[in-house]
Amino acid sequence: MLQVYLVRHGESEWNAARRIQGQSDSPLTETGEHQARLVAQRVKSESITHIITSDLGRTRRTAEIIAKVCGCEIILEPRLRELHMGVLERRNIDSLTSEEEKWRKKVLDGTPGGRIPKGESMDELAVRMRAALENCRNLPVGSRPLLVSHGIALGCLVGTILGLPAHAERRLRLRNCSLSRVDYQHSPWLASGWIVETAGDITHLDTPALDELQR
């Protein structure tokens, strides 16, 4: 059985400022750095062999903190990037016009053909995220990889493993530095292939999430 751990990056400056990041970038906040240290301690005893990360700065920094604790090298994987949000990237979510908000909702709610201008569809995201996960099956036998990616991207991956449409990720809350695990296995009691063992675990974190503070 192959066990693959999934970590969302730590809180970034644009997370805190409510700016749309997508494949644009901003550094981790002090809280984000702290979250990364906490999840690193959480997985320290899990015998992680590979840390594979999106090549964006916020995920790379999170991966660096985890790698230092786990003693692993970092592998960059562009297919783990966040959903490309096109012309809305870098914008504050509260500044969107009604038309722009319709674009954003269409891409996230599964509207056929939903796509922000110059951006990516949820189905395209699902294809590349699954390809990145499947590549883990080429690692040496006994490997226990950890993937560092993004909220929408990881939600899409976990949801599609469960047989849900790509846009169902909006029903799954994966907070900054939450920990999930998916396994590739063959069991007489479960579906063969990828299954979800756990999703969105935050028991290792010690501060409220942004969405809790902003209620």
UniProtKB/Swiss-Prot annotation:
Q: Which residues form the active site?
A: H9, E82
- Keywords from the named record: Glycolysis, Isomerase
Taken from the UniProt record, the cysteine pairs bridged by disulfide bonds within this chain are none
Look up keyword Aminoacyl-tRNA synthetase and say if it applies. Answer: no
- Transition state stabilizer (site feature) positions: H150
What are the binding positions for substrate in this chain?
8-15, 21-22, 58, 60, 82-85, 151-152
Entry GO CC = cytoplasm
Alphabetized GO MF terms:
phosphatase activity; phosphoglycerate mutase activity
Q: What is its EC number?
A: 5.4.2.-
The text of the family note is:
Belongs to the phosphoglycerate mutase family. GpmB subfamily.
The record's section on PANTHER family has:
BROAD-SPECIFICITY PHOSPHATASE YOR283W-RELATED (PTHR48100), HISTIDINE PHOSPHATASE FAMILY PROTEIN-RELATED (PTHR48100:SF1)
Q: What is this protein called?
A: Probable phosphoglycerate mutase GpmB
Origin species: Photorhabdus laumondii subsp. laumondii (strain DSM 15139 / CIP 105565 / TT01)
From the UniProt record, report the name of the gene that encodes this protein.
Answer: gpmB
